[in-house]
From Swiss-Prot:
This is Photosystem II reaction center protein T. Belongs to the PsbT family. Keywords: Chloroplast, Membrane, Photosynthesis, Photosystem II, Plastid, Thylakoid, Transmembrane, Transmembrane helix. One of its GO terms (biological process) is photosynthesis. It comes from Solanum lycopersicum (Tomato). One of its GO terms (cellular component) is chloroplast thylakoid membrane. It is a single-pass membrane protein. Pfam families: PsbT. The keyword Chloroplast applies. Found at the monomer-monomer interface of the photosystem II (PS II) dimer, plays a role in assembly and dimerization of PSII. PSII is a light-driven water plastoquinone oxidoreductase, using light energy to abstract electrons from H(2)O, generating a proton gradient subsequently used for ATP formation. PSII is composed of 1 copy each of membrane proteins PsbA, PsbB, PsbC, PsbD, PsbE, PsbF, PsbH, PsbI, PsbJ, PsbK, PsbL, PsbM, PsbT, PsbY, PsbZ, Psb30/Ycf12, at least 3 peripheral proteins of the oxygen-evolving complex and a large number of cofactors. It forms dimeric complexes. It is found in: Plastid, Chloroplast thylakoid membrane.
């Protein structure tokens, strides 16, 4: 059970960092190319 908790915390932390970097830069590729 502890392995599940540690993997969940690791994935959630990586997801938060990824979204922070993604939303910091303007996503011009997704918005301009419709």
């Amino acid at each position: 059970m502890e392995a599940l908790v540690y993997t969940f915390l690791l994935v959630s932390t990586l997801g938060i960092i990824f979204f922070a970097i993604f939303f910091r830069e303007p996503p011009t590729i997704r918005t301009k190319k419709n």
